[in-house]
Amino acid sequence: MYRALTRDIEVTVEPFYLAEQSDPEDSRYVWGYRVVIVNQSNVAVRLINRYWHITDQNGQVDEVSGPGVIGEQPRLAPGESFEYSSGCPLDTPSGIMFGRYEMETDDAETFDVAIPAFSLDTPDLRRVLN
């Protein structure tokens, strides 16, 4: 699991390889990831936008942004959490993702919350250390 805490908003990400949706012979590798956002602050916040920076093992970068997550702009009161799952296809057997959520308070103050960097590695990927 990967965690980041920004202004008492905790974001936890757990990636997992989806072998049944992947086809290595066709250079298609697919991961899912589960995100849990916990509002540990004393004010309500709404997730209004997302931004992802995705890099495959060849250095190819893909940037994804848009309103909310999975079609929602969830509002989290103090102490509440929101969980969702999504996915990411790559043409290579490994990569890395990180990003941010734009949050808004009930007073219309906006701020960014970090999504921690997390690795996307196929289970059979061998690491070579020199």
From Swiss-Prot:
Alphabetical list of Pfam families matching this protein: DUF525
Ranges for domain ApaG: 3-127
InterPro entries in UniProt: ApaG-like, ApaG_domain, ApaG_sf, Uncharacterised_ApaG
The organism's place on the tree of life at top rank: Bacteria
Stored HAMAP family: ApaG (MF_00791)
PANTHER family, sorted: OS05G0170800 PROTEIN
Protein's name according to its UniProt entry: Protein ApaG
